[in-house]
Amino acid sequence: MSADFEGYEQDFAVLTAEITSKISRVPRLPPDEKKQMVANVEKQLEEARELLEQMDLEVREIPPQSRGMYSNRMRSYKQEMGKLETDFKRSRIAYSDEVRNELLGDAGNSSENQLIKLREERAHLLDNTERLERSSRRLEAGYQIAVETEQIGQEMLENLSHDRERIQRARERLRETDANLGKSSRILTGMLRRIIQNRILLVILGIIVVITILTAITFFVRGH
């Protein structure tokens, strides 16, 4: 899975480098080439967005405990993408203004002032859009962190539950072992008691036999 992600990363790096180079060349190109270059950059930006989507899908399939590094890289790539789109918008505004100036020609100071005002309004709108995009990216990053934290918490709870079950099973085995040891101890005590009793009986029997033999010998001697 990480190999696919790294492949998308390499494609994204090459593509964004080409886009950056082309955006910087737009202002210096002749009108016909500018139009073609703008269309080409739009196509490549769409390809870059698709690569980001593929990379995002790959990151979502990574286990939560290993996802943090990839999520940070994704946030960096999305910020880079946002900057490219902003630079391209500014380049398009400059290109549109240039085309309009060529069409209008020398329409007078009034038209020029209106164009300047329109350019300022567009720049202001672009700044607001950029701020909204940054806020959206921060919210998305915060949401991803919250989701990852929740998943990690769930895994920790599951691990704790498994550990608790293992500890309980170990305690049960210890109780069973203690019970078995108690039974074994009682059995050994009973066996020792019977052995001692048997030895005492043997000693008593031995004494009785000896006394009987001695008595018989005594009577035998006296009879002769």
Curated annotation (Swiss-Prot):
Protein name, per record: Vesicle transport through interaction with t-SNAREs homolog 1A
Subcellular location, record wording: Membrane; Cytoplasmic vesicle, Secretory vesicle, Synaptic vesicle membrane; Cytoplasmic vesicle, Clathrin-coated vesicle membrane; Golgi apparatus membrane
Subunit structure, as described in the record: Interacts with distinct SNARE complexes that contain either STX5 or STX6. Interacts with NAPA and, to a lesser extent, with NAPG. Identified in a complex containing STX6, STX12, VAMP4 and VTI1A.
Purpose: V-SNARE that mediates vesicle transport pathways through interactions with t-SNAREs on the target membrane. These interactions are proposed to mediate aspects of the specificity of vesicle trafficking and to promote fusion of the lipid bilayers. Involved in vesicular transport from the late endosomes to the trans-Golgi network. Along with VAMP7, involved in an non-conventional RAB1-dependent traffic route to the cell surface used by KCNIP1 and KCND2. May be concerned with increased secretion of cytokines associated with cellular senescence.
Gene Ontology CC: autophagosome; clathrin-coated vesicle; clathrin-coated vesicle membrane; cytosol; endoplasmic reticulum membrane; endosome; ER to Golgi transport vesicle membrane; Golgi apparatus
Membrane topology designation: Single-pass type IV membrane protein
Similarity-based family: Belongs to the VTI1 family.
Vesicular topological segments: 221-224
Superkingdom field: Eukaryota
Cytoplasmic side: 1-199
Source taxonomy: Eukaryota, Metazoa, Chordata, Craniata, Vertebrata
Tissue-level expression: Specifically expressed in the neuronal tissues cerebellum, cortex and hippocampus. Isoform 1/VTI1A is expressed in the same neuronal tissues but also in lung, liver, kidney and spleen.
TM region positions: 200-220
UniProt xrefs under InterPro entries: GOSR2/Membrin/Bos1, SNARE, T_SNARE_dom, v-SNARE_N_sf, Vesicle_trsprt_v-SNARE_N
Record keywords: Coiled coil, Cytoplasmic vesicle, Golgi apparatus, Membrane, Protein transport, Synapse, Transmembrane, Transmembrane helix, Transport
Molecular-function annotations in GO: SNAP receptor activity; SNARE binding
One record GO biological process: synaptic vesicle to endosome fusion
CDD domains on file: SNARE_Vti1a
Origin species: Rattus norvegicus
